[in-house]
A protein has these predicted regions:
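Non-catalytic linker/capping segments at the edges of enzyme domains
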Residues: 1-42, 48, 82
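Short structured motifs
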Residues: 20-26, 89-95, 115-117
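A generic structural signal for short beta-strands and their flanking turns/coil linkers
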Residues: 20-22, 37-39, 87-91, 101-103, ...
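Residues located in well-ordered beta-strands
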Residues: 25, 92-94, 106-108, 133, ...
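A short, structured loop/turn motif at beta-sheet edges
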Residues: 29-37, 96-103, 135-140
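Hot-dog-fold acyl-thioester-processing enzymes
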Residues: 44-71, 81-82
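Hydrophobic beta-strand-centered segment that forms part of the acyl-chain substrate-binding groove
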Residues: 72-111
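HotDog/MaoC-like acyl-thioester-processing domains
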Residues: 99-100, 110-154
Length: 154
């Protein structure tokens, strides 16, 4: 699988203006073993996104993780967007440690893309998880989340 990370980043920033508003930076969108996809998105340190203790606001971190998961979905399933709409179905986040400074969300496809596509081809509405880890630039995990996505046939 070949992924044009610049095209994925541009597509996400075009489709989700809120990601531009928060200043997200797309660090990497890359294939992984067995048809997997990984996306890394960065939230710079900015007073505009701080909470009451001076770190990134929980809502900004949630949006960062959801955006990274969306980049995974776009990279993995962009070829079927003419016949299916990707939608987040549900998400859960656990805030583990206080985050300070810039944070990075690393999202990975939680199910083989081929399985998801086979369900879509069979006329189903597949669901699949995208686990996300949010960490400081030093690698300290501050949050973990899972976003469950679907591909809704047109």
């Amino acid at each position: 699988m070949s992924i044009d990370s610049r095209q994925v980043a541009a597509g996400m920033l075009d489709a989700v203006p809120f990601a531009r508003t928060l200043g997200f930076e797309f660090v990497e969108v890359a294939p992984e073993a067995e048809g997997g996809v990984r996306a890394v998105v960065r939230l710079p340190d900015s007073p505009a996104t701080h909470n009451h203790v001076g770190g990134p606001h929980a809502g900004a971190m949630f949006t960062l993780g959801e955006t990274a998961s969306g980049a995974v979905v776009l990279a993995a399933f962009g070829q079927v967007l003419d016949r299916a709409v990707p939608l987040a179905v549900r998400a859960e986040i656990a805030y583990r440690k206080l985050a300070m400074g810039p944070v990075l969300a690393t999202a990975r496809l939680g199910r083989p893309a081929a399985e998801v596509l086979a369900e879509l081809e069979a006329g189903q509405r597949p669901e699949f998880p995208v686990p996300v880890r949010i960490a400081t630039e030093e690698g300290k995990v501050t949050s973990e989340m899972t976003v469950v996505w679907t591909l809704r046939p047109n």
